[in-house]
Amino acid sequence: MENSVSSAALNAAREQLDAAEAAREVILLQHIANGVIIDSRTVQIAPDVVIAPGAVILAGTILRGRTVIGAGCIIGPNTLIEDSIVDEGSTVNASQVYSSHIGPHNNIGPFTHVRVNTVTDYGVHLGAYVETKNSNFARGNTVSHLTYIGDSDVGKYCNFGCGTVTCNYDGKDKFRTTIGDYCFIGCNTNLVAPVKVGDGAYTAAGSTITKDVPAQALGIARERQTNLDGWAEPKMEAYIAKKQKLEKEQSK
């Protein structure tokens, strides 16, 4: 197939790209001269971004809008931050942050999606495959992996087990979840908003919490386990026979 783009159009596009690259490099050099450590030309920084001296910006990082990065932060690699504040000493690794405020000495990522109006206090950890939105986290919270927290207010030093979900939307309206200080949210807990978990309360793994959990209480909402003796035996015999046949075929 013939290339329908004229030489003039290609030259104009090349000039535009070269100009954009030159402007981007000027911004990088200005930040480096101001004491920011930038280790790769793959970094993109918008003109209105403010970065304190001593921050480290790693390869593949994109800083957009009116983002502010504090001293001693390590941003990247492969991180996108837009219209957000990241306070001093925080790390944001391979994650995306939009219109939010990350507090000091936070550890964000990898693969964390911090959506609009997320606010974190000192020492918060949002780990792998965690998504937050319109939520406030007091100091010292740990949300390590595979969790969604939306429209929530979380007290200090809470721990969220893997698979926690705040069920904040009923198809029409959004509702808030309130979690007190020093709470322990067990793995695969569903918190059906509006709901409150009191200070120092626990939720048992696998629970769907639809009512408030009082302070210092254990909220548990799941069926009791029943074991049916011998139920698996005929299934297991057929399964083992199938695998033994496969082994013989593979050994030929």
Segments predicted by a language model, with ranges:
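Intrinsic disorder/low-complexity segments
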Residues: M1-N3, I81, G155
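General secondary-structure edge motif
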Residues: Q30-H31, V36-I38, P53-G54, A71, ...
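Generic structural motif recognizing short loop/turn segments at the entrances and edges of beta-strands
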Residues: N34-G35, D39-R41, L80, Q96, ...
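Short amphipathic alpha-helical surface micro-motifs
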Residues: D18-E21, E25-L28, D39-S40, I45-A46, ...
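Glycine-rich hexapeptide-repeat left-handed beta-helix
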Residues: A9, V92-K252
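Terminal amphipathic alpha-helical/low-complexity segments used for targeting or macromolecular assembly
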Residues: M1-T42, A46-V49, G54, A215-K252
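Acidic, glycine-rich loop-and-beta core segments that form the ion-binding/anion-interacting portion
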Residues: V43-A46, V50-L126
